[in-house]
Swiss-Prot record:
One of its GO terms (cellular component) is cytoplasm. This is Spermatogenic leucine zipper protein 1. Transcription factor that binds to the DNA sequence 5'-CANNTG-3'(E box) and the G-box motif. May play an important role in the regulation of cell proliferation and differentiation during spermatogenesis. Interacts with PPP1CC isoform gamma-2. The keyword RNA-binding does not apply. Residues 116-127 are annotated as: Helix-loop-helix motif. One of its GO terms (molecular function) is E-box binding. Residues 252-273 are annotated as: Leucine-zipper. The gene is Spz1. The helix-loop-helix and basic motifs form a SPZ1 specific bHLH different from the classical one. Its main location: cytoplasm. It is found in: Cytoplasm; Nucleus. Signal peptide: none annotated.
Length: 400
């Protein structure tokens, strides 16, 4: 729209030959890194600047002018497209080529040319169109196309030269790398061999140590087994000893009980023997008195002896009475034992009386004296029996 408005307001001039055939001639190698013009919509001030003086302009001239500008714009667009394609090809290559241009410099050049082209385009719009200027423009375009061709050829030559140089440099570098690499590889190979030898030596050393450790482990296991066997044997022995100690203790306790019973029975037997000895002594005394009465005419001596015996018997009766009191007090404390002692005493007295009765002499001159002696003997035997029973009871309680 902006192009049509500007073309309608331009002044009328004689038609000039169209620049289409010369402008459409494309260069064979369009590989330039410099842009000529940024195409866009024309500014609004261009339309307003030519409004009044161009009202009397013919429509035919206006149409020719519009076609000319449209053709120029198309040519510029084609050139820019070719330039953009060539730039993409160059950027796809190696960035270290000799023909590589940094982006900063290319942007600065593009900006400078853009400004110049815009100024020229504005001058063309403000100034009336002249055929001389159009010819100059054609010549400039031709010159630019020739220069572009020359630049492309130069760029191609430079690219070829740079590739050849790079190829030569690469070959030289590869040769140098091979030489240096072979030396480096030999050094590394020697290091690897040394390391392998060291590793083999260490492996031998470790194998020896492993064998020694295995032997030590075996010896340790054997010692451990022996210690276990000894501990098990000691446990078994201790258990057997404990099991044997229990019946041995029981046997000892039984033997101690038997010994205590035997000692108690021996004490009883000793007490009975003492009683029998006393009874025998009394009988011996009685027999002496009888012999004295039978043999001697005098009656004074036996009477004296009988009086002395009566005194002795009285003293014994007193002692027996005191003992009877003590036994009575003890019998009150334990009545069951007292009853058992009475039964034993009665049995013992019966036996003693039977023995005494059988052994008594049948002939006595004084029966009263004999009766008193018998009674005393019986009392004495009963008291001795009681004493023996009391001693037996005490021994049993002490053992308990």
């Amino acid at each position: 729209m902006a192009d049509s408005d500007s073309s309608s307001e331009m002044p009328a001039h004689s038609p000039s030959p169209s620049p289409i055939p010369c402008a459409k001639q494309k260069p064979p190698n369009t590989g330039i890194t410099i842009s000529l013009l940024e195409i866009g919509s024309l500014p609004t001030f261009c339309c307003s600047s030519f409004s009044e003086p161009n009202n009397n302009m013919c429509p035919i001239r206006k149409q020719g002018k519009v076609q000319k500008f449209s053709n120029l714009l198309k040519d510029v667009k084609d050139v820019l497209k070719n330039i953009a394609g060539f730039e993409e090809k160059t950027t796809d290559g190696d960035p270290f080529d000799d023909t590589y241009i940094p982006e900063d410099l290319s942007e600065l050049n593009i900006r400078g040319f853009d400004k110049r082209n815009k100024l020229r385009f504005k001058d063309d719009l403000f100034i009336h169109f002249d055929p001389e200027r159009e010819n100059t423009m054609r010549q400039e375009m031709l010159f630019k196309s020739h220069s572009a061709k020359n630049m492309v050829q130069k760029f191609a030559r430079d690219l070829c030269n740079s590739e050849e140089k790079r190829g030569c440099d690469g070959v030289q570098l590869n040769a140098k790398r091979r030489r240096t690499g072979s030396v480096h590889i030999r050094g590394e190979y020697r290091k690897l061999r040394n390391n392998m030898e060291q590793l083999l030596q260490e492996a031998d050393h470790w194998s020896k140590q492993h064998n020694e450790l295995s032997e030590l482990m075996r010896s340790y296991q054997e010692c451990h087994k022996e210690i276990k066997d000894i501990v098990d044997c000691s446990r078994v022995c201790s258990q057997t000893q404990n099991n044997n100690e229990v019946p041995s203790k029981q046997k000892l306790e039984e033997q101690v009980k038997k010994l205590s019973q035997d000692t108690h029975s021996l004490h009883l037997i000793a007490a009975l023997l003492e009683n029998e000895c006393q009874i025998l002594q009394q009988r011996v005394d009685i027999l002496r008195e009888l012999h004295l009465h039978e043999a001697g005419p005098g009656h004074e001596k036996p009477l004296q002896t009988s009086g002395e015996q009566d005194k002795k018997c009285g003293e014994q009766d007193k002692k027996c009475g005191e003992q009877d009191k003590k036994c009575g007090e003890q019998d009150k404390k334990c009545p069951k034992l007292a009853e058992a002692e009475k039964m034993d005493g009665s049995k013992h007295t019966m036996k003693t009386t039977e023995g005494t009765i059988t052994r008594k002499p049948k002939i006595f001159r004084c029966p009263n004296d004999c009766l008193t002696k018998k009674a005393r003997n019986n009392r004495f035997n009963a008291r001795v029996a009681k004493k023996s029973l009391v001693g037996k009871r005490r021994t049993i309680s002490s053992f308990r």
